[in-house]
Amino acid sequence: KDNNIIGGMAETWEVSDDGLTYTFHLRDGLKFYNGDAVTAEDILYSLNRAIDPEKSIFAGFLTAIAGIECPDDTTVVVTLKAPTPDFLSNFTMPCCAIVQKDSGESGDYKDLVTCGPYYIADWVKDQYMLFKKNPNYYDPSKAVTDEIKVTVAADDSTRLMEFQNGDIDLMMSTPRNNLPQLSADSNYKVEAFDTVTVNYIGFNVEAEAVSSKEVRQALAYATNVDDLIVGANQGYAQRVTTFTDNLDVLRNTGLEGYTHDVEKAKSLLADAGYADGLTLTLSITSGNTTEAQIAAILKEQWAQAGVTLEVTQYDAATLTAMKKNGEYQVGLTNLGRTGPDSALALSFIVYNPITNGMYTGWQNDECESLYLASCSELDVEKRAEMWARMQEIELDEAPLIPTYVNQDVYAMHSNVSGVQYNLFLGILPYTMQKTV
């Protein structure tokens, strides 16, 4: 809450002087939604599953854990291999949620027995998930709405049509170009929330045309971010000057980023051997109106610097595979942190082995050394200095051009109220209500 970690199942916790042992004290009387008590066996199963690379795709983010013990049903002791400044933040990830051991081992996630404010009552893949209130949750105020159904829409047009037809009460990922129309309609209301999700223009640095940092810098100078904020986001965004969000305590506040300078862009392109122009291909997600608008704006902006931008569209799965395989030149991407400490998310950029530099192919020895050193640096100022330097390096190399932090904008019918938002989890449905 408010960029801070607060207790949930754990009421209190303490950290040993050497930073290696975290002891969590759980609330008494915790129960799963089916009424069964939460036991030490369930806790050990759930947490060991989270750190097992054979069972959890998030295990790589919890490698600092050396062992987990539960002396009793209300005490959890986590021992680390080395002092880890972002451990507590990473330990709040959803993969560490506690489930009943028997239901987890069954492998049928439709029948997963959980202990949060809601549980999955029904799930049809690619269609919807139905959540119902947990009658045994320790804090009833966290579950006001009896039932929540989350539906999946194939594209922006389908989502908008279902919303206007009254099939859904609240629309996530509201198409930006429809916001003025929806805001002006008294049947609806629009609410915007600040986020920690940074948007980027990304380059495959192994593609010859953008392998030179001078070319990537030129494209950064050719980009007018303010136009992207207004033209593609209806103003629901804030410019960023580095690869992390504006609320991040690790942000290098001394960096001004790239300013819009067409002549500088032309000069850099000429230095890189493209004085007569350059043709590039931008790959975007089909059916995504915001990406289509960004592409149109970039096409016009980059043309002023002598760059011809061709745009191709692919479905999300195909495009993701292309990026992983390095089969693209220019793309659009974003990254949001999962907790108050941003190091886990930002490691995707600066530490190549994790995601191949956010699928850019970028690798920098100094960045990787700084990142590895920062993982065990408990001195706040020294750690911040390491991250400040990493941001300087990335901004100069420009495998990703940071553009803006967008706001999450939700359109809802006028009879919906009580919407809350969490910086790291997004919308919280706990207190949503609908009047008839």
Question: What are the language-model segments listed below?
Answer:
Residues 132-133, 191, 211-300, 389, ...:
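Append "and occasionally in soluble cytosolic enzymes with long acidic Gly/Pro-rich linkers
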Residues 1-17, 93-116, 120-122, 136-145, ...:
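Short, solvent-exposed loop/beta-turn-alpha elements that line the ligand-binding surface or hinge
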Residues 270-338, 408:
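Ligand/substrate-recognition segments at binding pockets and active sites
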Residues 11-55, 71, 77, 209-211:
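Aromatic- and charge-enriched surface segment that lines or borders ligand/interaction sites
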Residues 136-181, 308:
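Ligand-site clamp/hinge motif
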Residues 14, 18, 25, 60-101:
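Surface-exposed binding/hinge segments that line
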Residues 39-46, 73-79, 116-117, 145-147, ...:
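Alpha-helical secondary-structure segments
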Residues 35-37, 157-167, 184-185, 213-214, ...:
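Short helices/loops that flank or line small-molecule/ion binding pockets
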